[in-house]
Design a protein with these regions (language model features):
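PEST-like low-complexity, intrinsically disordered acidic/proline/serine-rich tracts
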Residues: 5, 9, 21-296
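Classic N-terminal secretory signal peptides
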Residues: 11-16
Length: 296
């Protein structure tokens, strides 16, 4: 096993270095590893004449393609996509309802307090769920097309979700006492269809209220509906747009992410996992003693 915690001096130095990185990563929303501009607009790095792509976000490595991209294949997102290419464009978070404000206050984000006193599910390696894993902890994604569904896989935490394309409807009753009630789930229930040949549209419902929307602790209810659009621009480029609608928590729908992914030439992801035992060691040896010394 790599990266085991060591009690030697070298191990402790490495651990302190790692802790500084972790603290820096939790100091602001990790929106896909990119940096937002002053206007909130995304900054897309263009392709060079030789087909070289370099993203501005730290999750996007430099890719070199043998030739300029060809046309997008029809009704097909299959394969592995790197990105996001840059910081996503987002709308301002709308005002919260009274219920939403109470939930937000109960979420102790490590953006406002020390990591040791936070109740962010990420700090205990609990499932991030959807849409947080897709929007605010996104690295690479992949799609696999099957006869009755599309499976989306996430590089971070190595998890996947089913997007049904067989015409079924989303469950209407979530966590209720009705006979047709469906249990809420970390990744909800998703159905998809093609709007033309190059735009895959996905609707998701039934999301577990225990998950957060982002690293700042914004909440959602089981009434949340998520709409996604994956537009295949060309052979190497895909644009994603995500809109949230949760009238129990927010006063209006809002566009929570719009960003660009690039086809990965080598079609291979690195493994990125949150390891509970590593996090427990970090909390015990670094986070909690540091919080005590700081008095918070």
């Amino acid at each position: 096993m790599k990266n085991r915690l060591a009690c030697s001096a070298v191990g402790l130095v490495a651990l302190f270095a790692a802790s500084s990185i972790m603290i820096a990563q939790t100091s602001q929303p990790r929106r896909n590893g990119g940096q937002s501009s002053a206007t909130g607009q995304s900054s897309i790095a263009p392709a060079s004449p030789g087909g070289e792509i370099e993203g501005t976000g730290n999750q996007m490595p430099r890719y070199k393609y043998p030739a300029a991209p060809g046309p997008a294949p029809k009704q097909d997102l299959s394969g592995e996509w790197g990105g996001p290419l840059s910081a996503p464009r987002i709308d301002p978070v709308p005002p919260l309802t009274a219920w939403g404000q109470a939930q937000f206050a109960a979420h102790k984000s490590n953006q406002r307090i020390s990591v040791a006193n936070s109740n962010d599910p990420l700090d205990t390696c609990d499932p991030l769920g959807f849409p947080r894993n897709a929007l605010w902890e996104s690295r690479g994604i992949a799609f696999a097309k099957m006869p009755d569904k599309v499976v989306e896989l996430f590089q971070y935490q190595r998890v996947w979700r089913e997007i049904w394309t067989d015409g079924r409807a989303l469950p209407k009753n979530i966590d209720s006492d009705l006979p047709d009630s469906a249990d809420s789930r970390y990744y909800g229930y998703s159905v998809g269809h093609w709007d033309g040949d190059y735009n895959f549209v996905v609707d998701t419902a039934g999301l577990d209220e225990d998950t957060w929307l982002d690293n700042a602790g914004h909440p959602h209810s089981s009434e949340l509906r998520v709409n996604e659009s994956y537009k295949r621009v060309d052979q190497h480029t895909m644009e994603m747009t995500v809109t949230l609608n949760d009238p129990k928590v927010y006063t209006k729908p809002w566009m929570a992410g719009q960003t660009t992914y690039k086809w990965i030439p080598q079609q291979q992801f690195d493994e990125q996992l949150c390891v509970p035992s590593h996090m427990q060691d970090y909390m015990k040896l670094i986070a909690k003693p540091s919080a005590g010394a700081a008095g918070k």
